[in-house]
């Protein structure tokens, strides 16, 4: 399929996707009933969309195009209410978190969808292993060239986004010692990590054409990059965050990305170059492994800085942009989180350290999601 022309979007408009866990009480393992749940709610959703993801234990909530985080929060809240009622009617529960702490990938059923079945054919068991749960944020751009500039700018802050959203310390019944283990699942995919270097939209079109020769890439949706342009929507899509345990944190993360995008495209503070990515995977690893306690290194100067310090600097830089787009509350909440030194991964570990079981942890996550 040829790459579509870049759709002109209103700059800094917002779209958010949340991949949620569908679980079966009282054992709280992943359910395989998302299709039943989607059928139950599809005629009750008036704004946004509830839809499938890769496997039958995943449920995606997606907003429409939103002006700001307040509009997005309203749409999510309405969808949450409908989904929770339908889940209760079918004796299911819903929760966030980047991984389910004890599910077995061998049990996961890929959705009966042409695209997902084709992906299963291409990638085999890797697709079942990809039963992990992330938050994706789209930001509108006025042109393809703006999208490429924004993508490179946001890529500088991938470690910050990962550290702030880290919520996947457990996988397959094991403490992984990572704050965010979810991104590791995609390391075996040939398109894992950052997008290959291009400097403008014309070069991106040539890159996509080359990738399509592999026969594994039919559309932009087949690419698993950390950040990718979405020409059909006219957006840049950030894909590195774990799904948070609460809607409020999800909205705050979206506000952070929207405000960062506003600052980047308004101020144009960087002259991007390929060398910017020299230490990308090392810095990304630090965020996944240690969260805000990780240390990132500047590829140009060799300077090292904790992610706590680097994130506080970012929040300070983007505060004026956040004020202009109505996202100040998100930046203030994230500032409090950084100062506290806590993320959701650490809260999960604290629960288990206090004697809680992994079954009890999922139950608690369902209570958090339902109680907000």
From Swiss-Prot:
Keyword ATP-binding belongs to the record: yes
UniProt xrefs under InterPro entries: GCL_type2/YbdK_subfam (IPR050141), GCS2 (IPR006336), Gln_synth/guanido_kin_cat_dom (IPR014746), YbdK (IPR011793)
Highest taxon of source: Bacteria
Reaction(s) this enzyme catalyzes, per UniProt: L-cysteine + L-glutamate + ATP = gamma-L-glutamyl-L-cysteine + ADP + phosphate + H(+)
Keyword ATP-binding in annotation: yes
An annotated GO BP: modified amino acid biosynthetic process
Family: Belongs to the glutamate--cysteine ligase type 2 family. YbdK subfamily.
Function according to Swiss-Prot or TrEMBL: ATP-dependent carboxylate-amine ligase which exhibits weak glutamate--cysteine ligase activity.
Protein name: Putative glutamate--cysteine ligase 2
Gene assigned in the entry: ybdK
């Amino acid at each position: 399929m040829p790459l579509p022309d870049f759709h002109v979007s209103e700059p800094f408009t917002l779209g958010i996707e949340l991949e949620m866990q569908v679980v079966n009480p009282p054992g709280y393992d992943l359910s395989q009933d998302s299709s039943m749940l989607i059928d139950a709610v599809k005629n009750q959703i008036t704004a946004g969309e509830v839809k499938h993801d890769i496997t039958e234990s995943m449920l995606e909530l997606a907003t429409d195009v939103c002006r700001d985080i307040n509009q997005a929060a309203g749409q999510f809240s309405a969808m949450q209410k409908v989904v929770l009622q339908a889940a209760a009617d079918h004796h299911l529960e819903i929760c966030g978190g980047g991984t389910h702490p004890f599910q077995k990938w061998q049990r996961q059923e890929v959705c009966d969808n042409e695209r997902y079945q084709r992906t299963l054919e291409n990638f085999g068991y890797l697709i079942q292993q990809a039963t992990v749960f992330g938050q994706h944020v789209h930001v509108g751009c006025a042109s393809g060239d703006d999208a490429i500039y924004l993508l490179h700018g946001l890529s500088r802050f991938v470690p910050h986004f990962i550290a702030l959203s880290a919520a996947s310390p457990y996988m397959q019944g094991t403490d992984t010692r990572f704050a965010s283990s979810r991104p590791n699942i995609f390391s075996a995919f040939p398109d894992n990590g950052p997008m290959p270097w291009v400097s403008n939209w014309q070069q991106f079109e040539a890159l996509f054409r080359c990738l399509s020769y592999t026969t594994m890439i039919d559309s932009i949706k087949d690419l698993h990059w950390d950040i990718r342009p979405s020409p059909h929507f006219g957006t840049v899509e950030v894909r590195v965050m774990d799904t948070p345990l609460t809607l409020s944190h999800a909205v705050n993360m979206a506000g952070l990305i929207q405000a960062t995008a506003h600052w980047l495209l308004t101020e144009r503070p960087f002259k991007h170059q390929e060398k910017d990515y020299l230490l990308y995977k090392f810095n990304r690893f630090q965020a996944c492994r240690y969260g805000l306690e990780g240390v990132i290194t500047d590829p140009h100067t060799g300077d090292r800085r904790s992610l706590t310090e680097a994130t506080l600097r970012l929040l300070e830089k983007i505060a004026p942009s956040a004020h202009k787009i109505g996202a100040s509350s998100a930046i203030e909440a994230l500032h409090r989180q950084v100062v506290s030194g806590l993320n959701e991964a650490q809260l999960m570990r604290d629960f288990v350290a206090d004697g809680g079981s992994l079954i009890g942890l999922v139950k608690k996550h369902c209570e958090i999601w339902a109680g907000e």
